[in-house]
Amino acid sequence: MNAALVSIEGLTKVYEGSGLFGRRRWTVQAVSDVSFEVRRGETLALVGESGCGKSSIARLVLRLTEPTAGRICFAGEPLAGMSGPRLKAQRRHMQIVFQDPMASLNPRKTIGHILGQPLAVHRGGRPAHYLDEIRQALALVGLTPPEQFIQRLPHEFSGGQRQRIAIARALMLRPELIVADEPVSALDVSIRAQILALMKRLQGELGLTYLFITHDLGVVRSIAHRVAVMYLGKIVEIGDVASIFAAPRHPYTAALLSASPIPDPEVSWRHRRIILKGDVPSPANPPSGCRFHPRCPAVLPICGTVAPVARELAPGHLAACHLNDPAIVGERAPGMAGTGVVEPPRAWRDPPPSFEKGRSDDHP
C-alpha cells in the first residue's frame, strides 16, 4: 500500500455571514468532520450531489480557503502553520484543473504567457523566458506542433483543446498532487473520453496523484482507484471502486448507483431504481442524527437522533450507516458471523447490472 500524500483529519469548514444591516446572522457548514487520505500515485474520486461540499474540500486542500477546524497534512507536513515563502514553495507541489477551461484561462493572454506564468512566479523572470518548458508541456498533453499554439488566444481553441492547455498549465511546476474539479463535465462525451485517457497516461508517466471531483459515476469507474461518497458535508462511504460498485453499504451510495443510466436494453428492464423522496436539506440547518435519514429508504428510529460512525466493513471499505451495526440491526449476513458485517437491505444490496457488464480492470 502506498503511503499517504494527503492526510485529512476532522476537517470542518463553516461559512458565516449576516443579512441586511447585520440584523440576522447565518452559518453554513459546508464540510463537517471529514477524514480521509489520498495515497501517492492513486486517483481518489470525491462524488456527491451539487452542494455537498466537494469543491470546498478541494479549496481547503490547496489552502485557497482556511479551515474552521481539523488538520491537513501534505507529505507529512501540516499546512496550517505555513505562510509566506514556505506556503508558496509548498504550492509548487499542488495544482488544480478547473471545471470550465474558458473561465479559467485569461482570454487576453496568449497560451505561451498562460503556461509560462507559473514558472515566472516561482522562478522569476518573464513567461517568455521558459519557451522550452512550454513546448514540452504542450507536447505532453498532445498539442503538437507546439509552435502552432504558443502565440494564440484561448478563444481560438475547442473546449477539449482548452482543457488540455489547462492541464498543461497544472503540469508546468511538476506537481505531485493535482486536484481536478469536474474537469470533464463541460465537455461532450467523445472529448471527455480523450481527456480521461490523457489524465491516466500522465499519471502513469509522471507518477501523479489525483483528487478527482465529479458527480458522474461512469467517470469514477473509468479513472479512479478509490471513491469517497459525500452527502451534505460528510463522507458517508469510502473504499475501492470495485468494492463499492459491487456492494454499496450505504443507502445513498446505492441510490447514486441505481440512478446511473443503463445503455444495454437487455438488462435495463431488470434495473431497480431507488427513488429518494424530498429535497436535499439546507447545510445551514442540517438534520439531526444521520443527515441522510429524511430521505433514506431504509431509515431506522435511531437514525434521526444518533449520527452513525464509520465502520470498516472490509479492508479499506468504510461506511457510516446504522444498518451496518449488528448491535442495532441484530442480524448478520450469511457466512459473515463474527465479522461485524450485516447484510444490506434487499432494496439496495445488489449492484445495478450495468456495473458488472463490461468492467474495466485498468487499475488495481
For the regions a protein language model found, what residue spans apply to each?
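Helix-to-loop junction immediately C-terminal to a conserved catalytic motif
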Residues: 62
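Conserved ABC transporter NBD signature motif
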Residues: 70-78
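A short, proline-enriched helix->beta-strand linker immediately N-terminal to the Walker B motif
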Residues: 172-176
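P-loop NTP-binding/switch modules centered on Walker-like glycine-rich loops
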Residues: 187, 191-269
